[in-house]
From Swiss-Prot:
The record marks N74 as: Stabilizes the phosphate intermediate. Small GTPase required for proper localization of RNA polymerase II (RNAPII). May act at an RNAP assembly step prior to nuclear import. GTP binds at G13, S14, G15, K16, S17, T18, T174, K175, M176, D177. The keyword Nucleotide-binding applies. One of its GO terms (molecular function) is GTP binding. Transmembrane segments: none annotated. A motif (Gly-Pro-Asn (GPN)-loop) lies at residues 72-74. Heterodimer with GPN1. Binds to RNA polymerase II (RNAPII). Interacts directly with subunits RPB4 and RPB7 and the CTD of RPB1. It comes from Bos taurus (Bovine). This is GPN-loop GTPase 3. Residues 261-284 are annotated as: Disordered. Belongs to the GPN-loop GTPase family.
Length: 284
């Protein structure tokens, strides 16, 4: 039987560890066994138990304290991840060979790991050799995405990971439970966006014609190919969490031996998901 994996990615502070902790709790409520692997060698603490922790293999602090290497925080993290890539046998021993595994990999937040370093791509290829079906889960902080330019920046970060890893990817706006009522109304337009409408909002502040043309090209690419869409993730709302899990399960065909149901908001009905979520929370 196949094994299943989520690569939980996103900028620092986007809520990756919180996502892993709450998703494990949600799956336990559904009688599903889910394990977590920490792949951040700079992590200090997290609110979940792990089946494997990269800090048992190598830690950023140890690398930075090595007088022969003389690395800073970012250089130290890159060194740790490259060392990890050369020691995948450690991960294989930690994972074992249990069938029907479902594992969340809590990844570091540095974007260079996905843009111009081969480490994460090598990890995906290794997991696939171990018969894992892998889905990328790219998180962005909803509090960061309430302005058009920041939203476009978040889309480009998600797109860079998607192109680099070449795996199914679900993009998620986290911390929806922390937004005010006004902010929730503002962010609704970013969940299933009309990029040309956002373009009109953005370019009025641009003084350079070159930047206007670039922004127009980026928005056109995103809108014409429907390459990036976001799902809301509210850790206080079980339905919101279940919708995200359904989309991930569909991407990797989890439970295909069972009678499988597509996410009820899939494709043409996707807008109803956002309407339902915000209707439920409009009076908060």
């Amino acid at each position: 039987m196949p094994r299943y994996a989520q690569l939980v990615m996103g900028p620092a502070g986007s809520g990756k560890s919180t996502y892993c902790a709450t998703m494990v709790q949600h799956c336990e409520a559904l009688n599903r066994s889910v394990q977590v692997v920490n792949l951040d060698p700079a992590a200090e603490h997290f609110n979940y138990s792990v089946m494997a922790d990269i800090r048992e293999l190598i830690e950023v602090d140890d690398v930075m304290e090595d007088s022969t290497l003389q690395f800073g925080p970012n250089g130290g993290l890159v060194f740790c991840m490259e060392y990890f890539a050369n020691n995948f046998d450690w991960l294989e021993n930690c994972l074992g060979h249990v069938e029907d595994d479902y594992i969340l990999f809590d990844c570091p937040g540095q974007i260079e790991l996905y843009t111009h370093l081969p480490v994460m791509k090598q990890l995906v290829q290794q997991l696939e050799q171990w018969e894992f079906r892998v889905c990328g889960v790219f998180l962005v902080d909803s509090q960061f995405m309430v302005e058009s330019f920041k939203f476009i920046s978040g889309i480009l970060a998600a797109l860079s990971a998607m192109i680099s890893l070449e795996i199914p990817q679900v993009n998620v706006m986290t911390k929806m439970d922390l937004l005010s009522k006004k902010a929730k109304k503002e962010i609704e337009k970013f969940l299933d966006p009309d990029m040309y409408s956002l373009l009109d909002d953005s370019t009025s502040d641009l003084r350079s014609k070159k930047f206007k043309k670039l922004t127009n090209a980026i928005c056109g690419l995103i809108d014409d190919y429907s390459m990036v869409r976001f799902l809301p993730y509210d850790q206080s709302d079980e339905e919101s969490m279940n919708i995200v899990l359904q989309h991930i399960d569909f991407a990797i065909q989890y439970g295909e031996d069972l009678e499988f149901k597509e996410p009820k908001e899939h494709e043409d009905e996707s807008s109803s998901m956002f309407d339902e979520y915000f209707q439920e929370h409009q009076n908060e």
